[in-house]
């Protein structure tokens, strides 16, 4: 599909707490490196190109950027790139960060943060982004976290102190979402989701919508590629629908995701200006009920 003149507004809007965002956003995980993300020996990406992509994203109407302090490669940090590219920040730009996981300066993974260590992670994001508060902070649940409530409570205290505006969770089950909601309001859930998801995952997306909680899928384009990006193999039905619309498989995957409900937000990431324009344009692609069913909508 043609991407000229299509902006992120084509996907519609959603409100995270009191912050209105276009449903087509941008994920910064892929900016610091070329190839697989979140590994110690990643190849640093081109800094000027990454900065240009971020600025172009905002020009195209993207006002929801997802990042984390642990998104970095040797020489490159997603937060630093965002700060350099976009500060002073537009008034409508919402930056969403994640805490819980951590990496040492060499890129190796550290044990999950304890509740008393979360303030340090929040302050690291504040420093790198050049902000005095964070718009939304997601607690990424890690297997070693015995109590989600204890960690979420620590973030709620930072929200009450004015360092955080709104809270979300990532990598959680419906039961864990309820556990967090018993502590403080949750504005978004960020989980892995896309074409081919399980019936349980579909049900969780629907449940979030009924509660007015945004659902923000990660790896919606990559499928089984995960952190390595999209793989060469593609779902046959995705390819068929893409051909029918003159679109790419990635655009079909994004459109399918967005049509799962008005509360679903997309955060595709890329370091390529052409792919950025294609991703944003996917917000204008409308699939028929038959096409949605063929791709797996229950």
Enumerate the language-model features and the residues they cover.
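Residues at the N-termini of beta-strands
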Residues: 23, 64, 133-136, 166, ...
């Amino acid at each position: 599909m043609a991407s000229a003149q299509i902006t992120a507004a084509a996907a519609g809007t959603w409100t995270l707490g009191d912050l209105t965002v276009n449903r087509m956003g941008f994920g910064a995980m892929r900016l610091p490196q070329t190839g697989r993300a979140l590994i110690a020996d990643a190849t640093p990406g081109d800094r000027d190109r990454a900065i240009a992509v971020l600025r172009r994203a905002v020009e195209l109407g993207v006002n929801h950027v997802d990042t984390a302090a642990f998104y970095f490669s040797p020489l490159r940090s997603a937060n630093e790139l965002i700060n350099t590219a976009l500060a002073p920040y537009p008034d409508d730009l919402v930056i969403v960060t994640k805490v819980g996981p951590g990496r040492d300066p060499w890129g190796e993974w550290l044990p999950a943060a304890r509740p008393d260590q979360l303030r340090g992670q929040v302050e690291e994001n504040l420093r790198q982004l050049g902000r005095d508060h964070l718009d939304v902070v997601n607690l990424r649940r890690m297997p070693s976290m015995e109590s989600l409530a204890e960690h979420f409570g620590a973030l709620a205290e930072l929200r009450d102190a004015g360092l955080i505006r709104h809270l979300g969770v990532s990598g959680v089950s419906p039961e864990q979402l309820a556990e967090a909601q018993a502590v403080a309001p949750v504005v978004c859930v960020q989980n892995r989701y896309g074409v081919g998801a399980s019936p349980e995952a579909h049900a969780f997306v629907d449940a979030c919508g009924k509660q007015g909680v945004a659902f923000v899928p990660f790896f919606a384009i990559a499928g089984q590629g995960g952190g390595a990006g999209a793989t060469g193999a593609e779902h046959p039905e995705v390819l068929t629908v893409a051909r029918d619309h003159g679109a790419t498989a990635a655009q079909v995957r994004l459109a399918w995701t967005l049509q799962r409900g008005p509360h679903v937000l997309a955060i595709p990431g890329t370091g390529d200006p052409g792919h950025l324009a294609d991703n944003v344009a996917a917000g204008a692609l409308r699939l028929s009920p038959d096409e949605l069913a063929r791709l797996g909508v229950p």
